[in-house]
UniProtKB/Swiss-Prot annotation:
Residues 250-254 are annotated as: ACP-binding. The keyword Transferase applies. The keyword Lipid metabolism applies. This is Beta-ketoacyl-[acyl-carrier-protein] synthase III. The lineage of its organism: Bacteria, Bacillati, Bacillota, Bacilli, Lactobacillales. It comes from the Bacteria.
Length: 324
């Protein structure tokens, strides 16, 4: 039987760092207000790199780490809500940039859950025994979709990309999954990004800026996401104590604090980096994973169990338990 495993992780970030103090020069806010409410101290902002540029750099790093040629890649999935264009997809641009001539490529649009959804799909593709190697990347340039006069959103988000190489193997590594969507609550977190109005349409152009009902999203994460994680652990007969690390979407430190208490796990098992990068949507989990590998916390030798969980626009939420 064919299974899949995560064999490499990599990330890439824009060079420009924007601190809370920098934001206080253009917004009515300050470092204490931002950091006490979110845990965020700074974020990366792209000056010229598009989402496909960040994603392509991650793909190149993954190939370098694995010491393989791009022609060995069978598929590329990029999770993003900030594509360079409607078409071609970011994944197609990555495929062309790295020369993965044998790979099919497509984007996954599931906001902050996108990387988890994409990783679950990659597992199924490889388990079909039709494909051997795939790149799964989360990449965002959210700064282009922020109203820089709205402190409720401008202070939260950052740009970046991270990803993994998923390969076929003979032992099960993807142990359990739980994926959800509730479109009836979609208006709690939106970004218009509509094309120009046609001469045959009566609709007005929608604002491209990210809009969020912060309280509704906070409550959703604490209630629905925590419940789904607890259910996943119970259904898979894995205890919270058996999980070495929880890698959750990096939205807000208060969310992680409350979720750790609800799940009944030591807070230090919940890894975080939002203080440095802010909320990078689909990129947050793979960036965190890659950094954790670099720090020696995650070994990529199959000896650890980690729980990955994303949640955000859609509304969407999903979790995976993976031996890594």
């Amino acid at each position: 039987m064919t299974y899949s495993k995560i064999s490499q992780a990599a990330h890439h970030l824009p060079e420009q760092v924007i601190s809370n103090d920098d934001l206080s020069l253009i917004l009515e806010t300050n470092d204490q207000w931002i950091s006490s409410r979110t845990g965020i101290k700074e974020r990366r902002i792209s000056r010229s790199e598009n989402t496909s540029d960040l994603a392509s750099r991650v793909a190149e790093k993954l190939l370098e780490k694995a010491n393989i040629d791009a022609t060995e890649i069978d598929f590329i999935i990029v999770a993003t809500i900030t594509g360079d264009s409607i078409m071609p997809s970011v994944a197609a641009k990555v495929q062309g940039t790295i020369g993965a001539t044998h790979a099919f490529a497509f984007d996954m649009t599931a906001a902050c859950s996108g990387f988890v959804f994409a990783l679950a799909m990659a597992d199924k593709l490889i388990r079909s025994a039709s494909y051997q190697k795939g790149l799964v990347i989360g990449a965002e340039v959210l700064s282009k979709y922020l109203d820089w006069e709205d402190r409720s959103t401008a202070v939260l988000f950052g740009d970046g990309a991270g990803g993994v190489l998923v390969e076929a193997c003979s032992e099960q590594h993807f142990m359990a999954e739980s994926l959800h969507t509730d479109g009836s609550r979609g208006q709690n977190l939106t970004s218009g990004n509509n094309p120009l109005r046609s001469p045959f349409s009566d609709s007005e152009e929608a604002s491209p800026f990210i809009k969020m009902d912060g309280r509704a999203i906070f409550d959703f994460a604490i209630r629905d996401v925590s419940k789904s994680i607890i259910s996943l652990l119970e259904e898979s007969s894995v205890t919270a104590e058996e999980i070495d690390y929880f890698l959750l979407h990096q939205a807000n430190r208060r969310i992680l604090d409350k979720m750790a208490r609800k799940i009944g796990c030591p807070r230090d098992k919940f890894l975080e980096n939002m203080m440095t990068y802010g909320n990078t949507s689909a990129a947050s989990i793979p960036i965190l994973l890659s950094e954790s590998v670099e720090k020696g916390l995650i070994l990529l030798d199959g000896s650890q169990k980690v729980l990955l969980s994303g949640f955000g626009g859609g509304l969407t939420w999903g979790s995976l338990i993976v031996k890594i």
